A protein has these predicted regions:
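Conserved hydrophobic beta-strand within the GNAT/NAT acetyltransferase core sheet
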Residues: 38-41, 71-74
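Conserved active-site alpha-helix within GNAT-family acetyltransferase domains
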Residues: 54, 66, 70-71, 77-100
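Active-site rim helix/loop that mediates acceptor-substrate recognition in acyltransferases
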Residues: 1-9
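A short, acidic/glycine-rich surface segment
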Residues: 20, 24-31, 81-85
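Conserved beta-strand in the GNAT
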Residues: 11, 17-26, 42
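Conserved acetyl-CoA-binding loop-helix of GNAT-fold acetyltransferases
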Residues: 43, 49-62, 86
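A conserved beta-turn-beta hairpin within the catalytic core of GNAT-like acetyltransferases
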Residues: 27-38, 48
């Protein structure tokens, strides 16, 4: 895994082959409290439905607790939403984007 002050990443391996990856960024909110943003959670197609994604996610959540975050946010595509709901995430708010 890679750990820096505001970034934590983890790699899942199977016999030296990368089969999953997760990363979370941390930042301090202006009004107080730290927040985590899950940037990536990827599992190779052939290794899905084996619990690897759940293990990666639990690891990211654990690190967010160590970092004393009060919440974790992420953006998800439609096929992944059920996975995140199953893991205890709630739908909330609207995300607006401005691409540069």
């Amino acid at each position: 895994f890679i750990s820096q002050k505001n970034l934590y990443s983890i790699v899942a391996l199977s016999e030296k082959e990368v089969v999953g990856f997760g990363s979370i960024f941390f930042f301090q909110r202006v009004r107080g409290g730290r927040e985590g943003i899950i940037e990536d959670l990827i599992v190779s197609r052939n290794y899905r439905k084996l619990g690897i994604g759940s293990k990666i996610l639990k690891n990211l959540i654990s690190e967010a607790k160590v970092q004393k975050c009060f919440k974790i946010c992420l953006e998800s595509n439609n096929p992944s939403k059920d996975f995140y709901f199953k893991e205890g995430f709630l739908k909330g708010g609207s995300i607006m984007k401005y691409f540069i």
